[in-house]
Every structure is written in C-alpha cells, then in structure tokens.
Amino acid sequence: MLFNNDSGNAEFTQFNKLAEKFGIQFNYDSKNHVLGNQYEMGAIQIDPGNLIFKSARKVYIKEYSSLAIHSPAAAVLKDGKTIVAAVARIGKGAVFAVGDPWFYNEYEDGRKIPVEFENYKAAEDLIKWLIYQINGR
C-alpha cells in the first residue's frame, strides 16, 4: 500500500522512485479543495462494480495528489477523469496506491464528516480486498 498526500504535505521525489516500479506516479498537485465545512466539495462517487470498493458509494477525499499511471497499473478510483487510486499487479503480489491518507485520518471515523460519506465502509472494502490478495489468489 502506497499512501501519499498532496504536494504541499508530502515528499514526492523519493516516493515516486518507488511508485514508478509499479507504473504509478504521484503528481505534484492538490485536488478537491474544500472551503470550511462545505464537505460536498470533497465528495467522490464510487461506481457499482468497483474492483475494490464493493459496498462504499461516496467518500470524502480532500486535497489529494492525483496519479498518473502506465502498465502494469490500472485506475480503481477516479474523480471524473482524474485518477485518485490505482492498483498494480506484479508477479503474485498487488500494490494499492492513493494520493491521500484518508483511510486512517480524522475523516475515517464518521465524527467529523456527514454520515452520507462512507469512508469507513471504503476502508473495510480495502481491507477485504487486501485479505483476498493474500488468501484468495
């Protein structure tokens, strides 16, 4: 798992050297700026049938670094045409990358963001996918 942040809050040069091995680059940008408590500005919709996020449909991700990808990576979460998260399969393993640490920060537990955001459910979906990568393949 590769969790980065937006360009103002993370190191990119060395991290991208690792990510490039998997066909992933974290862009030096910051997407989904949110003003105050206007949480809807940080909303990302998840389509049914998503490879990883099988139950979550709407998550809150603000100020993330977008991704650029090439083989073997594939996008697994987009905001319009912008890639938010990707997966790369290498040999018997898999790498998940996302441009924000939204699975383990203050937006995860449902106390700060409105209930319609399903960040906790998305984190559960990711954990189930990770376990399947170990046990189910």
What is each stretch, according to the model?
Residues 80, 99-101:
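Short, well-ordered beta-to-alpha junction loops that form the rim of enzyme active sites
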Residues 1-3, 77, 95-97:
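Structural recognition of the beta-strand scaffold that forms the well-ordered cores
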Residues 1, 55-59, 126, 136-137:
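A broadly tuned preference for mixed-charge, low-complexity surface segments
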Residues 25, 90-93, 101-137:
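Extracellular ligand-binding/catalytic regions of CAZymes and related secreted enzymes
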Residues 5-90:
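An acidic, glycine-rich "communication" segment
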Residues 1-8, 111-116:
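Second-shell loop/turn segments in exported
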Residues 40-49, 98, 128, 136-137:
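Noncatalytic linker/hinge segments flanking ATPase motor cores
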